[in-house]
Amino acid sequence: MNITLFCSVFILISLAGLSVSDDVPGNYPMSLYGNKYSCGVLGENEYCRKICKSHGVSYGYCFNSRCWCEYLEDKDVDFWAAHKNHCKNDKLYPPKK
């Protein structure tokens, strides 16, 4: 009886943990040529972090041999779109009137 109760409680707690997932939205950024950035060192690395910062987000890592940026929105996936959205240079991108 005690074992059955223990197993039931354990299964319920396990299922509750599955429903609360920590999936973070993100995207693979695209280079000037429309390709995903390749990376050789899986996991956290400085190269992917720099790529993600150039696309306007603060964190990224190598996943599936491509740089993955957490919280990268669809509008910033393309290299030039990201720079246009985040560039502070008024001469390059004059403010809209």
From Swiss-Prot:
Pfam families: Toxin_3
CC annotations in GO: extracellular region
Superkingdom, taxonomy of origin: Eukaryota
Signal peptide (from-to): 1-21
Tissue expression pattern: Expressed by the venom gland.
GO molecular function: potassium channel regulator activity; sodium channel inhibitor activity; toxin activity
Disulfide bonds: 39-62, 48-67, 52-69
Annotated localization: Secreted
Sequence ranges assigned to domain LCN-type CS-alpha/beta in this UniProt record: 25-88
Keywords, in A-Z order: Disulfide bond, G-protein coupled receptor impairing toxin, Ion channel impairing toxin, Neurotoxin, Potassium channel impairing toxin, Secreted, Signal, Toxin, Voltage-gated potassium channel impairing toxin, Voltage-gated sodium channel impairing toxin
Gene3D superfamilies per the UniProt record, alphabetical: Knottin, scorpion toxin-like
The protein's role, per its UniProt record: The heterodimer non-edited LVP1 induces lipolysis in rat adipocytes. Induction of lipolysis by LVP1 appears to be mediated through the beta-2 adrenergic receptor pathway (ADRB2). The edited BmKBTx-like, similar to beta-toxins, may modulate voltage-gated sodium channels (Nav) and may block voltage-gated potassium channels (Kv).
Known partners and oligomeric status: Monomer (edited version) and heterodimer (non-edited version) of this alpha chain and a beta chain (AC D9U2A2).
Family: Belongs to the long (3 C-C) scorpion toxin superfamily.
The record's note on its domains: Has the structural arrangement of an alpha-helix connected to antiparallel beta-sheets by disulfide bonds (CS-alpha/beta).
Protein name: Lipolysis-activating peptide 1-alpha chain
